[in-house]
Amino acid sequence: MSESTETVASARCAIALGSNLGDSLTILEAALKALAQTPGVALEARSQWYQTKAVGPPQPDYLNGCALLTVTLSPQPLLEALLRIEANFGRIRRERWSARTLDLDLLLFDAVILNTPTLQIPHPHMTERAFVLVPLAEIAPHWIEPISGKSIAQLVQTVDCSEVRLA
């Protein structure tokens, strides 16, 4: 991973946070603090925490939420910062959908559409996931997802939210 410091004037982005190993509430709160202390990142808003069933093999339920950031980092350096924070909280990347101490996903970056080998913006599965859309709609209902052209409030109406409950 490069220690790129590529910057932009200022951008608004949305991230998803999740945890299902360890003291998830403490981990997620500490991750928000770590984000806010990251150079080039300002925490603007955060959702409440939601409990959801895990996707994939049997494992503990997740605690999920979303945050809005104002950043002066471009997308790739921001992703690298998110990955460093995950690693600092003990995240070990194994198989897909495995349990994790901390998962930070870059969902949206202004109206950018980006597809590189290491990063896709918008996040490729965000429009299918109630555990992302419910907390995101709480803090950014009018944000337009650039591929569908729909607001987050519209997108959340297209998924089954019955398994997403306030923690």
Q: Positions of the model-derived regions?
A:
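Flexible, gly/pro- and Lys/Arg-enriched active-site loops
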Residues: 40, 44-47, 52-63, 73-79, ...
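Generic preference for hydrophobic/aromatic residues in regular secondary structure cores
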Residues: 1, 7, 162-166
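N-terminal beta1-alpha1 ligand-phosphate binding loop
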Residues: 2-41, 46-51
